[in-house]
Design a protein with these regions (language model features):
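Active-site His/Glu-centered metal-binding helix of metallohydrolases
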Residues: 146, 150, 154
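Hydrophobic alpha-helical transmembrane segments
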Residues: 1-142, 155-291
Length: 291
């Protein structure tokens, strides 16, 4: 849908800064109306006439939209290629889940990219959707996923999307502002249950959570780096261009492939804590306990 809308809108509006900003605003409005409005109407109809079907569909959508399992599966493909395959195979596997250039990455670089992706997407793909589902049910979760998908497709700071994708990127920053910070603290708390470095996770989270151009991306990366006692982030190539980025965490020990497995354990721990916290929040909203 987003790709089709982009193609149509680019043909309608002039190819200048104002036209691209206007077109970008229009695509944001249309995607938000569709992603939030359609599930709302479908569930409203089903709960009115076929309540059991409405419940089943809502549960199915919840399962489909929470990316915990897929995030683990994709990152573990990288781990498997690092342990049992070639470096080129590992580079290809990680290229499927990151936006940076991976052709020249070392084993350490591939591992760091996978760990960073697990950390960042624990918020975007799991904890943030759970929060929005707790507040507004599946329709609000769909709306959030629409915003997040727009950012992943349009939110690049290159010539093609600098203006066209600006509103989508800013809206994603707003939508993730609170969830990212909750996710960071849930990861810190998750170290208690995974045997990781709780003290360092809290220290690095508070110190390095702003070490990123995005106001949200470093939140979970900082908690993850501290929990694992490693250093993440740093300079990276995107579309053939080197971007200088600050590091996150201290290199107490070198990054190793096993950190991908550890990152997934921490992601699951944070997600389970999120289920508990957001379940209580949802119960409070639904049954008036927060009034």
């Amino acid at each position: 849908l987003i790709a089709v809308l982009e193609k149509v809108i680019r043909k309608i509006f002039p190819k200048n800064h104002g036209g691209e900003l206007t077109g970008g605003f229009l695509i944001v409005v249309l995607v938000c109306l569709f992603s939030g409005g359609v599930p709302l109407l479908v569930l409203h109809y089903l709960y009115r006439y076929l309540p059991v079907a409405g419940f089943v569909l809502e549960v199915f959508w919840c399962y489909q939209l929470l990316a915990t399992r897929s995030l683990k599966d994709e990152s573990m493909k990288v781990y498997d290629r690092l342990k049992n395959g070639t470096l080129d195979e590992a580079r290809y596997a990680v290229s499927m889940i990151v936006g940076r250039d991976t052709r020249e990455l070392t084993e350490t670089g591939v591992t760091k990219a996978a760990v960073e992706t697990v950390a960042e997407n624990a918020s975007d793909g799991v904890i943030a959707p759970m929060l929005y589902m707790a507040i507004g049910g599946v329709p609000l979760m769909f709306l959030y996923k629409g915003i997040n998908t727009m950012d992943s497709m349009l939110g690049y700071k290159n010539d093609k999307y600098l203006y066209f994708g600006r509103i989508a990127a800013k809206l994603d920053d707003v939508a993730n502002y609170i969830p990212a910070r909750i996710s960071g603290w849930l990861m810190v708390a998750g170290t208690v249950f995974t045997g990781m470095d709780t003290k360092n996770a809290a220290k690095i989270y508070k110190r390095d959570r702003r070490n990123h151009a995005s106001p949200n991306s470093a939140q979970t990366e900082a908690a993850m780096a501290g929990a694992l006692d490693v250093q993440l982030a740093g300079n990276a190539y995107y579309f053939g261009k080197l971007y200088e980025k600050p590091t996150i965490g201290d290199p107490i020990r070198p990054v190793e492939p096993e950190d991908i497995k550890r990152a997934n354990r921490l992601m699951y721990a944070a997600s389970i804590l999120g289920v508990v916290v957001f379940g209580l929040l949802s119960a409070g909203i639904r049954f008036g306990l927060l009034r």
